[in-house]
Amino acid sequence: MFSKIKKINFFKKTFSFLIAVVMMLFTVLGTNTYKAEAATTSFGGQLKVVGSQLCDSNGKPIQLKGMSSHGLQWYVNFVNYDSMKFLRDKWGVNVIRAAMYTNEGGYISNPSSQKEKIKKIVQDAIDLNMYVIIDWHILSDNNPNTYKEQAKSFFQEMAEEYGKYSNVIYEICNEPNGGTNWANDIKPYANYIIPAIRAIDPNNIIIVGTSTWSQDVDIAADNPLRYSNIMYTCHFYAGTHTQSLRDKINYAMSKGIAIFVTEWGTSDASGNGGPYLDESQKWVDFMASKNISWTNWALCDKSEASAALKSGSSTTGGWTDSDLTTSGLFVKKSIGGSNTTSQTSAPTFSLQSGTYDSAQTVTLTSSDNDSVIHYTTDGTTPTSSSPVYTSPITISKTTTVKAFTTKTGMTDSNITSAVYTISNTDPVKQVSAPTFSYNQEHTIQLKL
């Protein structure tokens, strides 16, 4: 501020005087500003296993439904932020499985590139508020112990980087086969890998494959693992596997273990032939009756019956029914998706835009149950990576709030905003000048 000079005449007679100075001080008001957490969890929150059921954070049984990728070394281009967002909004998908093969040009021969593909998919799922299965896709290697050291190192790294996110699910061995058995091979492998993950991530779900291409869940049920939040996978293809495999699942669940069908197809076990929609419907109805979560094989345009997309389809979503195969149409309907998905309602602000003379509190609400509000307070456009609204926002200075609503199975709302100007909040402070005594005239300079 500028200096103000004032000449003050003093008479020879000694006297005292008091100078009152009023000045405006710009101060920052209270520092208890609301801090939001990032969007790190899907609609069910922290998953857990209760008895034979996968449950949400409140202990309520939940059924996840979604898509599995094909091998990432071949069809990773179909699994990206845009395609996953489309599946979430248009089909109602809430889980994605990233199938990272060990052999056939997969992780063992190309660890760095395959790991980067997995990381991109996992981060996209987190940003989209979806669950994601990290699949160690053993197949031609038959026995999970073949690469158990690489598996341990890989899952430790995944747990270190993503274990804090409840979106993440670990699948530690896709389809043990070729004479590999539960007691001598798979269970010892699981007892080696699971503690390595649990030392870093104590809570997220771990899924374990079973013998005979993950069909022998009944054998695992008679000799289960002794850890919490463990599930066992059963894989089926409708043209090959029918009631006898459902009987195995019924038995396993009656023994108290939880099942997650991380891979199933409308085709026969080769991935081609069919699709067999009548038997597929029996399976879909069965899984719904048991609250068994599932991911369908496969999100790709490969020329085989189990592929969801026709050859040459877009890799970034936006698919209409004409882009889908017979299998893709069936699976979309089974998940609950529609190409006429409604839009969720925009959030409502408790306080209108305007000028206020003191700090204000703003509440954001949505008329859609189970929806999530993302917002910003710096004037930037909010995205699904922006903070999730969980409690009132304190406005202590001029602020632009922008927000939108998301809900699984619906398209995102329009972005709404409000501008709040806070004025006259700077306190006026009265400062007393010192007392002076002179016996002759002086000039005093006051600096404000």
Curated annotation (Swiss-Prot):
Its EC number is 3.2.1.4. It comes from the Bacteria. It catalyses: Endohydrolysis of (1->4)-beta-D-glucosidic linkages in cellulose, lichenin and cereal beta-D-glucans. The active site is at residues 175, 263. One of its GO terms (molecular function) is cellulase activity. GO terms for biological process: cellulose catabolic process. It holds the Pfam family Cellulase. Substrate binds at residues 70, 74-75, 101, 137, 237, 269-270, 297, 302-304. Residues 1-34 form the signal peptide. Keywords: Carbohydrate metabolism, Cellulose degradation, Glycosidase, Hydrolase, Polysaccharide degradation, Signal. The keyword Protease does not apply. Transmembrane segments: none annotated. The C-terminal region of C.acetobutylicum is not required for activity. Belongs to the glycosyl hydrolase 5 (cellulase A) family. This is Endoglucanase. It comes from Clostridium saccharobutylicum. The lineage of its organism: Bacteria, Bacillati, Bacillota, Clostridia, Eubacteriales.
